[in-house]
Amino acid sequence: MNHFLDIHKTDAADLRAMIDQAGAMKQARLGRPKAAPDDEQPLKDRMVALIFEKPSTRTRVSFDVGVRQMGGQTMVLSGNDMQLGHGETIADTARVLSRYVDMIMIRTFDESVLAEMAEYADVPVINGLTDRSHPCQIMADVLTYEEHRGPIAGKKVVWTGDGNNVCSSFLHAAGQFGFDLTFSGPAQFDPEEEYMGFARQKGSKIVIERDAVKAVEGADLVVADTWVSMHDAQSAKERRHNLLRPYQVNAELMRHAKPDALFMHCLPAHREEEATSEVMDGPHSVIFDEAENRLHAQKAIMRWCLGA
């Protein structure tokens, strides 16, 4: 049994095996109806709990479909359905759920909730997102890059805007998959030093460049994410927009990257803010392949968690 809690907590060889398996599973499904079962059914007769303290489209649908394609069933639980950390301890919730289900995926705010769930659960726990990390997304991103351009090792990735939880997982992935990462954004939105330090210790070149044009020069992949959260107050949104506007990914900025550079965004996007529709719908963009690959990457993650 394995937990999938973060990129840096998983062996690099296991991460590589998951990416390779995800690609093979995707190829095996080409041309099949979405509800058709996979040839192999590693989740047959298995029940997976999908816990959402934060709203979700891609995470919920991709995990639900993936479990069903591999022969399992899902139980979707929201914060309103549970007493997670309110009235009942997370430890007790983890112990109880372990008696009912074979695997737990949790999308939560506080990373400590994920850690405690994994500590006390007797079944695999998967990090569907926390305020500090989003490893499933980055596995999909690596898969997407490699199916379009080949191995990501040695490539230059540029992250624009806010050094948020997705950026943090990208830095972990830089260390584990051997690519370099340049962050371009205002100083107050820099990634945490521990994430950059991990990648540097692994031999990746991690650079902070305030000038977005200089940052994307020679880039193989340019990545953007939303500048604001649904929970931000209006005044905070306006302030963030003013600070981050110079880091918008538009056609002019992409012209400074390599001619065959890819553009990614984990979605949902605020079009014309962090990136323009011209870029998002243009020839560099692979955002919808990226969204689809959440399904395939997570199926490989679930198989790994169960040793299947």
Swiss-Prot record:
The listed locations are: Cytoplasm
Report whether Cell membrane shows up as a keyword of the record: no
UniProt GO MF annotations: amino acid binding; ornithine carbamoyltransferase activity
**Cellular component GO terms held in the UniProt record:** cytoplasm
What processes does the entry annotate via GO biological process terms? arginine biosynthetic process via ornithine; citrulline biosynthetic process; L-arginine biosynthetic process
- Uppermost EC category: transferase
- Family assignment? Belongs to the aspartate/ornithine carbamoyltransferase superfamily. OTCase family.
Which HAMAP family does its entry note?
OTCase
UniProt function note: Reversibly catalyzes the transfer of the carbamoyl group from carbamoyl phosphate (CP) to the N(epsilon) atom of ornithine (ORN) to produce L-citrulline.
| Protein name (database record) | Ornithine carbamoyltransferase
